[in-house]
Amino acid sequence: MNIKVMRVIFFTRQIDRMSEYYRDVLGLKQVTNEKSWREFDAGGLRIALHSGPPSPGKKGPKIAFYAKDVAATRDELVERGARFGKIRQGEFLLCDGKDPDGNPIQLSNR
């Protein structure tokens, strides 16, 4: 069997706000724009937004975005309105943040 991740789907009650975030703040190319379904090209997989309530008690996955220069990328995204914490360094650099619905996202050079 040969499978791969095709898309990550977030259910949201704020589809327009979330679309603006992934398109305008993170700079992802929007490839589908329907009333209750939006998709964004995230370089090898798609992030999809589906209008509707999240499942009660369920937390979404963390999406980790690769950035060669984590500090410069973080600074640019924060200027655009993204929320990220401090950069942590171990074997690699990473920085955690949240999208407008509170789903965890991360920048990493790993």
Enumerate the language-model features and the residues they cover.
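Conserved acetyl-CoA-binding loop of GNAT-fold acetyltransferases
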Residues: 24-30, 82
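Mid-chain, well-packed structural core segment of small domains
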Residues: 63-77
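Conserved short beta-strand elements that form part of the metal-binding/catalytic scaffold
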Residues: 29-61, 104-110
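N-terminal beta-strand motif that seeds the catalytic metal site of vicinal oxygen chelate
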Residues: 1-19, 46, 61-63
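Conserved active-site alpha-helix within GNAT-family acetyltransferase domains
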Residues: 16-25, 104
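Vicinal oxygen chelate
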Residues: 1, 74-75, 79-110
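Alpha-helical segments within the soluble intracellular
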Residues: 23-24, 41, 78
